[in-house]
Amino acid sequence: MANFIDRRLNAKGKSTVNRQRFINRYKQQIKKAVSDAVTRRSVTDVDKGEKISIPTRDISEPMFHQGKGGVRDRVHPGNDQFTRGDKIDRPQGGSGGGAGKGDASDSGEGNDDFVFEISKDEYLELLFEDLELPNLQKNRLNKLVEYQIYRAGFTNDGVPANINIVRSLRSSLARRIAMSASKKKLLKESEQELAELENIPGTKAELILDLKAQIEELKRKIAKVPFIDTFDLRFNNFSRREVPSSQAVMFCLMDVSGSMDQATKDMAKRFYILLYLFLTRTYKNLEVVYIRHHTQAKEVDEHEFFYSQETGGTIVSSALKLMHEIQQARYPADEWNIYAAQASDGDNWADDSPTCKQLLEQKILPLVRYFSYIEITNRAHQTLWREYESLQQHYDNIAVQHIRQAEDIYPVFRELFKKQAV
């Protein structure tokens, strides 16, 4: 009985190439489904795969089929009513989308959609396609390189600690074979000749003695071939490779004053998670600093940032001051790519908004790569929005956007991080 072993790279019954063709062909429909899925998902599920549903009419293929006109000769099975030459009425069926009788058709409306699943990587690839980190400039960070030691074959010289015994013995064997092969062949022939001469009566003793001397000389030369020589030694070679140090820090600043209800906080959290996933696809090392503020700001962990019930009044500048202090103490601007995302409902103590502008203008914007401010509210903008908006006229690394409902989160995110025209 024959046994077949499937050694294909793709899973049984699947084709990665065809899958990628399908995704590329219907990318617009899939991207729309991905965009819709972002608003439906819970915060904890935002980075998982997704079931994509595409209307059947969007994936229909051109096909040849019988037209509605013309004269046709057919033989219908089970005919007991008509004979050749009879004329019958054309069946009044639907256009292929219903259950009526009639000819098949590729038109008509149906309710069944084509549903398939995309993986987490495919989902994130579509989610962040055509996006980039704004104002990503080369500074000292790109000159700070780490050296990674890696194996680089073998070399003929090195320190004893790096000697490769197997390679050295293999080289020794090859050298000994090369240097003694001809002598061993000649020795074997000489020994055979000596045995034949000794079996022949009347052979001259001088001839036998000369042959024995030749054999001894060959054995001496073969024995003089050293077992191992410095020429045979092989050492493991190690080389250094430059590895650019790619590290970034993201400051998440969230207003938790009494005016920020749980729904508003949840929308802010969705935005932060999208930003985190986006940055992790660019940087290997990403640190996140969570700062909550009402009248006072405090650095917290992730759980407390999103779920703490602490609340109070609103002084936004306290968060900006704390962010600057943490950045100065732990994240030098010449070694880190610094990003910040601030979410608020825009409700701030009126006298504090100019202070926020001053902090951004003098201490924060000169150091950060990008500062994004999203205001989540259905009310009219207040002083904080106007102060932040005025900074956009002088700085290209700050952006302010308005979110009214959950459906606005993903479009706003794409607007903040869309690729800039060259």
Curated annotation (Swiss-Prot):
Region (Disordered): 60-111
HAMAP family in alphabetical order: UPF0229
Family in the record: Belongs to the UPF0229 family.
InterPro entries (alphabetical): UPF0229
Basic and acidic residues bias: start-end ranges: 70-90
Protein name as it appears in the record: UPF0229 protein SO_2883
Organism: Shewanella oneidensis (strain ATCC 700550 / JCM 31522 / CIP 106686 / LMG 19005 / NCIMB 14063 / MR-1)
One Pfam family from the record: DUF444
Domain of life, per lineage: Bacteria
Entries under NCBIfam families matching the protein: PRK05325.1-2 (NF003707), PRK05325.1-3 (NF003708)
